């Protein structure tokens, strides 16, 4: 005998005719071949008339196919002989029992027979290679295939026929078949192979001859026997679903709960914890009745005397009480009916239509497909036959049906039977009903249906070395380590997408574990997949309309994407004015622009923000969008929206970048181009900050002064352009911050109204020496250039001081060493009276040397000054209403000395005494009367020292060796030199005399706040002899050179220009 090992040749002794019999049971689709040969006659299949003649086979003389018995009817045959070209194949068309004769039917090519695994004959390898699809083996597979023929069969490895998994222990195989096998829910799965000789003492074998399943314990055998008997003792009282095990019923009960809100759908019970909710479900909505079958539940006994409208209620004989058929609750009349509503929600016919439970084995033999994992598809499937015998209307149970597209692989169809009066059973179309949750197996994991994929399990077969279901036969064990390794390599190649399954495979590739296609993550463990889908999947918040469609990745708007270094294609632009036809070749994901994120103008406050607030990009991309997980600025994709929100709020690179200017919707013009990239922070040296050449400043014209509403009381006399506030002009903060030292020319904008408040981010630019914050960079640079005491005097200012001091010191007409800055209301003084009192004075940092210019300027200022004024210590866009002195006292803590007798003080007039920086002679000082000073007076302050080393040539007589000035008998008060940005004002300087007598200073503005005290750099002169361990700006002397270098590198106030949060 040279045929397959599964077959044997039997030659009759009487007539000498040979027959082919099966040694073992063969499955449907078992194949042998190919064999070189052809049928007798034409290329088409021979007809029935040709079968009367003994066919001749064009095959080898010793081929076993010529002994196969041929039949004329396909229904009588258990095998099929067909050909493909010049090759002949033999395949079983149904299950062939042991010792059964092979009867074949001739066919040209089978169309309805599934393409199962074929077995390759050892002598026909070359022929098989030329016909089967080519599959290039990996080097490891080729080496293993070479030694496969001589490999020793490992009999201690136990394979699973349906899953293609080999186990080293039979106990592991049994556990796999009971809990994890993909085909464990199918009642038509092939029978297991015979048990090994050595059996374990605690194992139990199923007594059914067609099953012979081995169970590790008695309890597991009892549970397994329920699949044969149809017993379902665990019942869900909400939907009346029955289950074989308690775990399956408890898992089903979770469907009737809202775990997010903790609400039970059955009775409305609300719980704060999930454990209490599950305990409530098991206690109140699940019962266990041993011996319950798959009848329509609950069982109702017919009581002729009582016709109840509720099937779960029955009447007890010789009593007026009614009993609930579910829980045994006893009550009278309608109390039981109201109680029964807790168990059933769908209407069921009356109790007169009784149901008698038929034998369950008959039902199961007729409809074996109605069982899955021992659980009935619907209770009506088993009781329909009993209803038909009693010739009564069957009970109709409304079953919740799922859409066909959303059913899982494990959900199979079940048939429902309906009977009419006197009519036999008519089988209705199969419907798919909702059953218990399938087991977490790779075969039932939610994977997308691909083209050519089969729903059942199967093994991945290499065409050159085909190993089918016969590999698990008892006499041909194919469970070596070589085959296991080759199968593992094939699985890994298919998983990585490096190969495509040929058409000759016996089944589709079953992926290992499960894949989340929304997050593009593959899990080896199915439990990890379930945890991911429940807690971490990005599709948890996606709405229903988005879940069915393809996943659309949303990114940042195009302008942010361009700023980040990549471009994107605007596929769905909401504004019709946008050019949607532009295409980009950059390899990025398509961007879907939301309708509410159009190209509208940015509102106020869209500039830089502080640490705790939202970033600029979060204003454009609201965090409320639960679908956004891509950060375009950092080019990072997050799996969860919560992680994306935390990243955008605390870690995103766009938090400190200014938002790019948004293009107007209705603004015509060329396409939008990105702004230049802001310069990074650079460590600047001292000469870079203060080494700016002074610009020529001219007095403002009366036309320019006519637009000024308030004048700042500061000594700097340079007119700065009016800076728009962030609230009035969003374009001012739209572009990148320019940290250059040159003030930009900005178009004039109307001064904000009196109701304007302090703009946000007022501490963005801060002068560390003066402790003053500025809203704009121009105001900060103007302060550092002209008003900051740490800035050195410019050459032009020194020359002007010398010119002004020389005539004053020669004539001795300098009456007072202070400058009176006077601010009056419009009706207080006329321009003429003011012009008579103007005298040339020595003003610090003054650029006006002509008294006529000052006279002209002061007259225009007083004429245009209103009741509202500005504070030198507040931001430039804040206008003070009312008394400025009261504002100084309440807001800034500045104290005013009481006026002397005979001084007239009006509510609209304020005089501020500013000490002249260039004192000429001590004789003029001694000739002036001084106010009385007590020992505790705050006028005796060390703030009377010289402010700058540039005065060393003019104050050499009043300075000591260490740089401290010699205090005179009358200390002079000092005004805090911390001006506000000189944006729209010029100081008004005036010297006033009354009755030809020198005026005694009556009002002195004292520094009451620490922030308003004179800066430290003006206290000590630099150390002589060129000592480089002394910081002139910070007025700190260091003992070591290393400490001095560290101070200049990290802590010096010269880095004030870089003070950007």
UniProtKB/Swiss-Prot annotation:
Domain of life where this protein originates: Eukaryota
Cell compartment(s), UniProt: Nucleus
Entry binding sites for Zn(2+) 4: 767, 770, 783, 788
Residues engaged in binding Zn(2+) 2: 516, 519, 532, 537
One GO term of the biological process aspect: negative regulation of transcription by RNA polymerase II
Stretches annotated zinc finger (C2H2-type): 204-228, 234-256, 262-285, 869-892
Compositionally biased residues, Low complexity: 378-388, 933-942, 954-972
Keyword entries, A-Z: Activator, DNA-binding, Metal-binding, Nucleus, Repeat, Repressor, Transcription, Transcription regulation, Zinc, Zinc-finger
Tissue specificity comment: Predominantly expressed in heart and brain. Also expressed in ventral blood island and adult spleen.
Renumbered residue ranges of the record's region Disordered: 349-393, 435-455, 561-586, 599-630, 661-681, 917-1021
Record field: compositional bias (Polar residues): 436-448, 565-574
GO molecular function, one term: RNA polymerase II-specific DNA-binding transcription factor binding
Pro residues composition bias: residue spans: 973-984
InterPro entries, alphabetized: FOG, ZF_CCHC_FOG, ZFPM1/2_PR, Znf_C2H2_sf, Znf_C2H2_type
GO CC term, one of those recorded: nucleus
Binding site for Zn(2+) 5: 1031, 1034, 1047, 1052
Pfam family, one: CCHC_ZFPM2
Main location: nucleus
Similarity comment text for this entry: Belongs to the FOG (Friend of GATA) family.
Notes on the domains: Some of the CCHC FOG-type zinc fingers probably directly bind to GATA-type zinc fingers. The Tyr residue adjacent to the last Cys of the CCHC FOG-type zinc finger is probably essential for the interaction with GATA-type zinc fingers.
Reported function: Transcription regulator that plays an central role in red blood cell differentiation. Essential cofactor that acts via the formation of a heterodimer with transcription factors of the GATA family GATA1 and GATA2. Such heterodimer can both activate or repress transcriptional activity, depending on the cell and promoter context. Acts as a repressor of red blood cells, probably by modulating activity of GATA1.
SUBUNIT field: Interacts with corepressor CTBP. Interacts with the N-terminal zinc-finger of GATA1 and probably GATA2.
PANTHER family in the cross-refs: FRIEND OF GATA2-RELATED, ZINC FINGER PROTEIN ZFPM1
Protein name (record): Zinc finger protein ZFPM1
């Amino acid at each position: 005998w040279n045929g397959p090992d599964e077959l044997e040749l039997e030659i009759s002794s009487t007539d000498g005719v040979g027959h082919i019999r099966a040694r073992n049971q063969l499955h449907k689709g078992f194949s042998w071949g190919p064999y070189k040969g052809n049928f007798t006659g034409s290329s088409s299949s021979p007809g029935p008339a040709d079968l009367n003649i003994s066919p001749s086979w064009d095959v080898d003389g010793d081929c076993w196919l010529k002994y196969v018995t041929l039949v004329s009817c396909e229904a009588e045959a258990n095998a099929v002989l067909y050909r493909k070209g010049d090759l002949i194949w033999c395949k079983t068309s149904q299950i062939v029992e042991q010792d059964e004769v092979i009867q074949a039917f001739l066919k040209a090519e089978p169309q309805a027979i599934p393409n199962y695994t074929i077995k390759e004959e050892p002598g026909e390898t070359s022929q098989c290679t030329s016909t089967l699809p080519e599959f290039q083996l990996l080097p490891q597979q080729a080496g293993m295939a070479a030694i496969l023929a001589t490999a020793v069969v490992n009999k201690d490895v136990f394979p699973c026929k349906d899953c293609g998994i080999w186990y080293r222990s039979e106990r592991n195989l049994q556990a796999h078949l009971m809990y994890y096998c993909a085909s464990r829910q199918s009642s038509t799965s092939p029978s297991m192979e015979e048990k090994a000789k050595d059996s374990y003492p605690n194992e139990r074998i199923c007594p059914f001859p067609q099953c012979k399943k081995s169970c590790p314990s008695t309890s597991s055998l009892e549970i397994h026997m329920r699949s044969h008997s149809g017993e379902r003792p665990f019942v869900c009282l909400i939907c009346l679903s029955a289950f074989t095990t308690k775990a399956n019923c408890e898992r089903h009960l979770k469907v009737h709960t809202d775990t997010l809100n903790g609400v039970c759908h059955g009775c409305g019970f609300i719980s704060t914890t999930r454990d209490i909710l599950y305990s409530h479900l098991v206690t109140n909505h699940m019962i266990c009745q041993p011996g319950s079958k798959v009848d329509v539940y609950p069982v109702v006994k017919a009581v002729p005397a009582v016709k109840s409208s509720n099937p779960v209620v029955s009447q007890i004989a010789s009593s007026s009480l009614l009993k609930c058929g579910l829980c045994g609750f006893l009550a009278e009349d309608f109390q039981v009916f109201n109680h029964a509503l807790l168990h059933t929600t769908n209407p069921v016919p009356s109790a007169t239509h009784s149901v008698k439970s038929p034998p369950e084995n008959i039902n199961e033999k007729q409809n074996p497909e109605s069982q899955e994992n021992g659980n009935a598809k619907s209770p009506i499937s088993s009781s329909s036959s009993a209803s038909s015998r009693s010739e009564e209307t069957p009970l109709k149970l409304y079953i919740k049906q799922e859409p066909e597209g959303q059913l899982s692989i494990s959900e199979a169809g079940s048939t429902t039977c309906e009977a009419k009066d006197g009519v036999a059973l008519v089988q209705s179309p199969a419907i798919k009903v909702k059953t218990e949750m399938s087991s977490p197996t790779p075969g039932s994991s939610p994977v997308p249906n691909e083209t050519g994929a089969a729903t059942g399990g199967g093994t991945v077969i290499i065409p050159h070395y085909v190993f089918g279901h016969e590999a698990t036969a008892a006499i041909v064990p194919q469970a070596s380590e070589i085959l296991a390794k080759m199968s593992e390599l094939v699985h890994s190649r298919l998983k990585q997408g490096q190969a495509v399954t040929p058409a000759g495979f016996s089944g589709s590739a079953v992926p290992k574990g499960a894949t989340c296609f929304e997050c593009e993550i593959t899990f080896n463990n199915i439990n990890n997949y379930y945890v991911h889908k429940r807690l971490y999947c990005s599709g948890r918040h996606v709405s229903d309309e988005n879940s069915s469609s393809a996943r659309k990745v949303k990114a940042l708007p195009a302008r942010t994407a361009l700023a980040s270094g990549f471009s994107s294609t605007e596929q769905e632009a909401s504004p019709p004015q946008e050019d949607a036809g532009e295409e980009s070749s950059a390899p990025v994901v398509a961007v879907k622009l939301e309708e509410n994120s159009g190209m509208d103008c940015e509102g106020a406050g869209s500039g830089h923000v502080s640490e705790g607030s939202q970033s600029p990009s979060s204003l454009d991309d609201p965090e409320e969008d639960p679908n956004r997980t891509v950060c375009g600025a950092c080019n990072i994709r997050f799996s969860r929206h919560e992680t994306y929100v935390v990243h955008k709020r605390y870690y995103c690179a766009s938090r400190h970048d200014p938002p790019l200017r948004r293009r107007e919707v209705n603004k015509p013009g060329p396409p939008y181009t990105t702004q230049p990239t802001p310069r990074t922070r650079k460590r600047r040296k001292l000469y870079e900050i203060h080494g700016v050449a002074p610009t020529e400043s001219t007095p403002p014209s009366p036309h320019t002064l006519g637009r000024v509403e308030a004048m700042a009381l500061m000594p700097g006399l340079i007119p700065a352009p009016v800076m728009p506030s962030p609230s009035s002009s969003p374009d001012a903060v739209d572009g990148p911050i320019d940290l250059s030292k040159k003030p930009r020319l900005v178009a004039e904008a109307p001064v904000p109204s009196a109701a304007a408040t302090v703009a946000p981010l007022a501490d963005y630019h801060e002068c560390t020496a003066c402790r003053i914050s500025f809203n704009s960079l121009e105001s900060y640079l103007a302060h550092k250039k002209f008003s900051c005491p740490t800035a050195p005097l410019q050459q032009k200012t020194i020359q002007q001081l010398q010119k002004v001091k020389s005539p004053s010191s020669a004539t001795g007409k300098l009456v007072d060493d202070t400058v009176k800055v006077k601010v009056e209301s419009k009706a207080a003084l006329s321009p003429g009276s003011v012009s008579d009192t103007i005298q040339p004075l020595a003003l610090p940092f003054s650029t006006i040397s002509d008294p006529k210019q000052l006279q002209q300027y002061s007259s225009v200022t007083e004429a245009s000054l209103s009741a509202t004024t500005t504070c030198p210590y507040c931001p430039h866009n804040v206008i003070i209403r009312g008394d400025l002195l009261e504002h100084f006292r309440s807001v800034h803590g500045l104290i005013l000395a009481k006026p002397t007798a005979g001084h007239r003080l009006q509510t609209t007039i304020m005089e501020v005494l500013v000490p002249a920086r260039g004192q000429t002679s001590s004789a003029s000082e001694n000739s002036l009367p001084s106010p009385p000073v007590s020992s505790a007076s705050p006028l005796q302050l060390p703030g009377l020292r010289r402010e700058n080393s540039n005065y060393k040539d003019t104050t050499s007589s009043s300075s000591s060796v260490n740089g401290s000035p010699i205090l005179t008998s009358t200390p002079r008060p000092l005004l805090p030199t911390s001006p506000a940005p000189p944006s729209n004002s010029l100081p008004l300087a005036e010297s006033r005399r009354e009755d030809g007598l020198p005026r005694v200073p009556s009002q002195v503005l004292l520094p009451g706040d620490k922030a308003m005290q004179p800066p430290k750099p003006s206290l000590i002169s630099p150390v002589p002899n060129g000592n480089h361990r002394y910081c002139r700006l910070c007025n700190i002397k260091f003992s070591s050179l290393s400490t001095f270098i560290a101070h200049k590198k990290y802590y010096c106030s010269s880095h004030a220009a870089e003070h950007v949060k």
